[in-house]
């Protein structure tokens, strides 16, 4: 998956990420850009407009929760399937989330990182993060196989 150099780069960079801000923005953008994903969050209240979604405190809180889990994965890059086994089971068996949504969220996260970090989020770092989000999406989809 990742070389030792790539792991060091993504881990060092991840230390600069404010998961509360980035998580809320990433989940919010997912819900706006891919509105069919909103059906999993009907209990979050008003998701009727982009502004409503992006300013929704429940979206922000859940986005932080999602990125807290992602942060845990960043500490276990060699065992993503093990790290995300319980979440894979939850999303498959109880929530019935389409595993394609994990890929979408990963790609949205990369967009948000690029937006927030600008030139610091180099093309090489983006390539490394694409590997990470693909690995996390695969781990979350593992229960579906």
Swiss-Prot record:
Q: What PROSITE patterns does its record include?
A: GLOBIN (PS01033)
> What are the entry keywords?
Heme, Iron, Metal-binding, Oxygen transport, Transport
Q: Name one GO biological process term.
A: hydrogen peroxide catabolic process
Identify the tissues in which this protein is expressed. Answer: Red blood cells.
Q: Where along the chain is heme b bound?
A: 62, 91
Would you say which domain of life the source belongs to?
Answer: Eukaryota
Q: Which GO terms describe its molecular function?
A: haptoglobin binding; heme binding; hemoglobin alpha binding; metal ion binding; organic acid binding; oxygen binding; oxygen carrier activity; peroxidase activity
Task: List each copy of the Globin domain by range.
Answer: 1-145
What Pfam family does this protein match (any one)?
Globin
Give the multimer and partner information: Heterotetramer of two alpha chains and two beta chains.
The record's comment on protein family reads: Belongs to the globin family.
Q: What is the name of this protein?
A: Hemoglobin subunit beta-A
